[in-house]
Amino acid sequence: MPRKPQQPRAHATVGAIVEAGFISLARNGVENTTTRHIADIAGVRVGSLYEYFANKEEVFDAMHEHMVREVVGMVRPLIPTLVRMDIRELVAELLYRFRDLLERDDGRYLRYMSYAAYFAPRGQIEPINRLLMDLLMKYVMHHPQLVRLGNLPAMGFIMINGGVFTVIRYLTEPNPTVTFDDLVRGLGDMVAHFVDGELQRAGSAD
């Protein structure tokens, strides 16, 4: 039965296996990634991998937890700055940061995210959802006129997830027809136009 790492050396081994999982996934895809591929890239015996993971799916789970920590670690320190930005600046900052994270280390995180929807444990995404809702609520506190928007949590969820999917789709396109800067401006305009329109509608109803 796989065990949890206790000693620093064991933690280092598990970390190497998880990083190797990202590399193997980028090279071989989901179906063709095997525990042997992962172990070889990590520089450990397959038996050592099985000390901590029962199969490649458990490695994928650990990769997802790692990715969630990376996203949370990227966004959380930015919140005090993000909440003071206007809508377009906020969208641009988040999208550029997200792109930089995905393209780091030869794009291994990008390849993972392009597959993640197929096998990522849904419950493990909750820390990101909580963080983004916290960002949304704090943003509204700094921009109290937004309280008048109807169904704000639902629209925030749709726009955040839609933006993430759009960035991943763009970055995995071999020959995109627009620049990333244009994409960011377009998404920022879409969110800003929605907010402005809803605020005008709310004002007309008063």
Name what the model sees in each region.
Residues 17, 21-25, 71, 98, ...:
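Short hydrophobic clusters on alpha-helical segments that form packing/core surfaces
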Residues 110-114, 122, 142-190, 201-206:
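Hydrophobic/aromatic-rich alpha-helical bundle segments in the mid-to-C-terminal region
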Residues 76-81, 111-120:
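Short linear capping/connector segments at secondary-structure termini
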Residues 60-67, 112, 128, 132:
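Alpha-helical DNA-contacting segments of helix-turn-helix folds
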Residues 1-12, 23, 199-206:
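N-terminal intrinsically disordered/low-complexity leader segments
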Residues 12, 16, 24-58, 62:
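Helix-turn-helix
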